[in-house]
Regions:
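Single conserved hydrophobic/aromatic residue that forms the stacking wall/gate
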Residues: 1-5, 9
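C-terminal outer-membrane beta-barrel translocator/porin domains of Gram-negative envelope proteins
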Residues: 6-7, 103-204
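Predominantly the C-terminal beta-signal and adjacent terminal strand-loop region
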Residues: 52, 104, 243-274
Length: 274
């Protein structure tokens, strides 16, 4: 049998996410919520039997639907030991810590709730940290892994941390801590991943002898990122960037399974952040 018009990736996704976060004690946050999705095929699915093959049994055919509904309660625990802060009136302003920030994000899809059609579990761990070395020199690193487990019927890989838009908190730019050249299809192609990111920031790395032409550059950055998942072992990204009062820019080179992957550039404005 060959799949006809219905490609499971060509679906409209109607979704609703809700989460409420409470700080239990200084540096310890717990968030509770849920997510609901209704994914409908852009075109209805059909199977076309080719050759002398018999029609698949009903229990096999029932696994393929035009509409998939999921409902999943979610809990997120985030901890930053030794977090410094100050109070601005009644508002608490978090500053920094000499220890990393740890987070665990767990979600469980429940079959039958609001007509949901499948079960799954998603768990992700994330660690991120900034090490201040003085004289505007900083090291940033981030490490994380995640997996979908205990899935029943077809499910959709939709990680919370492993996303192009899930930026680390407190870093001096919006480039480090995520992948910049990685093809978007990889974010939803595997049920597990392990990744790491490293950034070194300093005022003078490569441009120290060009100060006449680069006096507006505040700092330079070296980026190194790595990712491991099935069929991509490993993915590597190396980049170089500069930061000014107004913008940040970075250039990246990638490698997939030890072969050249591509070259990319990221440009962000920082006009209202500095």
């Amino acid at each position: 049998a060959s799949r006809g018009l219905g490609d499971v990736y060509k679906r409209q996704d109607l979704y609703f996410n809700f989460r409420h976060t409470v700080e239990i004690v200084n540096g310890l946050d717990i968030g509770l919520g849920f997510s609901a999705h209704k994914r409908t095929a852009v075109e209805p699915s059909r199977f076309v039997i080719t050759g002398d093959y018999p029609m698949p049994p009903p229990e096999f055919m029932d696994k393929f639907k035009n509409t998939y509904i999921s409902f999943a309660p979610r809990i997120r625990i985030e901890s930053t030991p030794g977090l410094y802060y100050y109070m601005n009136g009644k508002r608490k302003i978090n500053l920094h810590s000499i220890y990393p920030t740890f987070s665990v994000d767990y979600e469980r899809g429940i079959k039958g709730v609001f007509k949901s059609t499948g079960e799954y579990e998603r768990i992700e761990f994330d660690l991120q940290h900034q090490i201040r070395m003085g004289l505007m020199r900083n090291i940033y690193y981030r490490f994380g892994f995640g997996a979908f487990t205990n899935q029943d019927e077809l499910y959709f890989v939709d990680f919370a941390n492993f996303s192009r838009h899930n930026l680390p908190v407190g870093w001096n730019d919006e480039i480090g801590g995520v992948f910049q050249v990685l093809d978007s299809r990889w974010y939803n192609s595997s049920r597990r991943y392990v990744r790491g990111h490293f950034t070194y920031e300093a005022p003078f790395l490569i441009l120290r002898h060009l100060m006449k032409y680069t006096r507006y550059v505040q700092n330079e950055r070296i980026y190194i990122s790595a990712l491991s998942m099935p069929h991509l072992q490993p993915y590597l990204e190396v980049g170089y960037g500069i930061g000014t009062h107004i913008f940040d820019v970075g250039v990246f080179v990638s490698s997939e399974n030890w072969k050249f992957g591509g070259i990319g550039c990221k440009f962000t404005f920082e006009l209202f952040n500095r």
